[in-house]
């Protein structure tokens, strides 16, 4: 199957990522473009697992509203499809926090948890940390994070959730 023939396929279980040529140029059209990057992520994960001699793990944490919980499920599904195994944040190779800006308590918890992740990343420098959600759409928040929390690898808002596979591939 060629990637161009799969672009209408919405059931990820029916897509054979191993048949996608990740050495070709990524398709311009969505969702074929994201399938390409899911395949690329899977190959990256497999290679990293061979190097480490163990499975790569991930942790998804949601702060805030029910909409975030739904988005986090989608993100966790993409991580699983790429080959990550769910784990606690202490053991995770990739941690993603889905943030909320509406609930101030959630905002404060994110900043507190970032200090905790910073300590974990000192012990595991290969750990990747991502922040997403509506809090990441506020320019002043993003600037603060980029300046004061430079250990964070990926920051993206809700308008880029559909590009998560592409953004994830860029982290490695």
For the regions a language model picked out, list residue spans one by one.
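Short, hydrophobic alpha-helical segments
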Residues: 168-172
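Cofactor-cradling patches in redox/metallo enzymes
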Residues: 1-167
């Amino acid at each position: 199957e060629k990637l161009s023939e799969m672009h209408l396929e919405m059931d990820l279980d029916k897509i054979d990522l191993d048949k996608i040529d990740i050495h070709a140029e990524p398709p311009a059209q969505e969702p074929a473009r994201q399938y390409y990057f899911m395949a690329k992520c899977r190959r990256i994960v497999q290679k990293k697992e061979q190097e480490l001699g163990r499975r790569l793990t991930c942790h998804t944490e949601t702060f805030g509203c029910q909409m975030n919980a739904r988005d986090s499920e989608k993100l966790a599904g993409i991580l699983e499809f790429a080959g990550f195994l769910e784990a606690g944040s202490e053991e995770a190779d990739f941690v993603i926090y889905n943030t909320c800006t509406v609930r101030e308590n959630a905002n404060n918890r994110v900043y507190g948890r970032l200090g905790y992740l910073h300590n974990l990343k000192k012990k595991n420098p290969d750990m990747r940390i991502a922040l997403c959600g509506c809090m990441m759409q506020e320019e002043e928040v993003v600037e603060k994070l980029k300046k004061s929390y430079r250990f964070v690898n990926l920051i993206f808002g809700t308008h880029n959730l559909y590009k998560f596979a592409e953004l994830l591939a860029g982290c490695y």
